[in-house]
């Protein structure tokens, strides 16, 4: 099917089952996706094949969710988040078959963070802006802005630029390995952008 009158300006593949409360203009929902009532999707998102989005999930603008990922109740993805194929979010710390929580823990993925293929995110964590979660990593605790995280349990092994490349640590000032002209300074609890664009789509 095309976007239809319910979601003007969006594209919905004819095999997708879509009952979301809202889908923004320019968003594309591909084959065999299931978007439940009570979910909300922003503008210009890419929801790839076989993605499941549950009631209560919220996606901002320009979000990409690759094939086979599941986004559950209590999970919010801010603008520009990238979710790799097969990423598994969880929303119940002590699950039992047939039991349901009155309120699910809130998991927040901040703007432009990226989660690599097969990463697992445990309930109630906050993943910071521009953070990069490596493929297969298990996120068990909050992650700082710009952190590069790998392993099980996930641990920070460095910092990444707005553009996604790893930063070169030169003391108080850090620079991008790719030479994108952004610079960073150390701040309490992590690093902060000191110069250059905060938009990954620009140099």
Describe each model-derived feature in a short phrase.
Residues 1-8, 197-203:
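Short, low-complexity, intrinsically disordered N-terminal peptides in bacterial proteins
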Residues 172-183:
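Cysteine-rich micro-motifs
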Residues 87, 155-158, 165, 191:
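Flexible, active-site-adjacent loop/turn segments at secondary-structure boundaries
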Residues 145-152, 160-171:
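Short, intrinsically disordered, charge-biased short linear motifs at domain edges
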Residues 182-199:
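Short metal-binding segments enriched for Cys and/or His
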Residues 5-150, 154-156:
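Structural signal for interior beta-strand "rungs" in well-ordered beta-sheet cores
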Residues 173, 188, 201-203:
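Intrinsically disordered, low-complexity terminal tails/loops enriched in metal-binding residues
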């Amino acid at each position: 099917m095309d976007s239809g009158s319910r979601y003007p300006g969006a594209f919905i593949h004819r095999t997708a089952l879509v009952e979301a409360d809202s889908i923004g203009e320019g968003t594309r929902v591909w084959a065999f996706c299931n978007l439940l009532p009570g979910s909300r999707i922003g503008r210009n998102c890419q929801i790839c094949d076989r993605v499941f989005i549950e009631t209560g999930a919220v996606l901002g603008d320009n979000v990409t969710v690759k094939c086979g990922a599941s986004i559950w109740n209590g999970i919010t993805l801010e603008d520009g988040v990238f979710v790799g194929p097969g990423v598994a979010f969880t929303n119940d710390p002590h699950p039992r078959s047939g039991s349901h929580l009155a309120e699910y823990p809130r998991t927040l993925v901040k703007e432009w963070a990226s989660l690599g293929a097969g990463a697992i995110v445990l309930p109630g964590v906050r993943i910071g802006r521009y953070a990069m979660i490596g493929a297969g990593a298990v996120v068990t605790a909050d992650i700082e802005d710009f952190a590069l995280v790998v392993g099980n349990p996930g641990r920070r092994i460095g910092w990444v630029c707005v553009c996604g490349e790893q930063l070169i640590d030169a003391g108080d000032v850090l620079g991008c390995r790719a030479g994108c002209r952004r610079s960073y300074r150390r701040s309490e609890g992590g690093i902060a952008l000191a110069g250059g664009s905060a938009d990954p789509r620009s140099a």
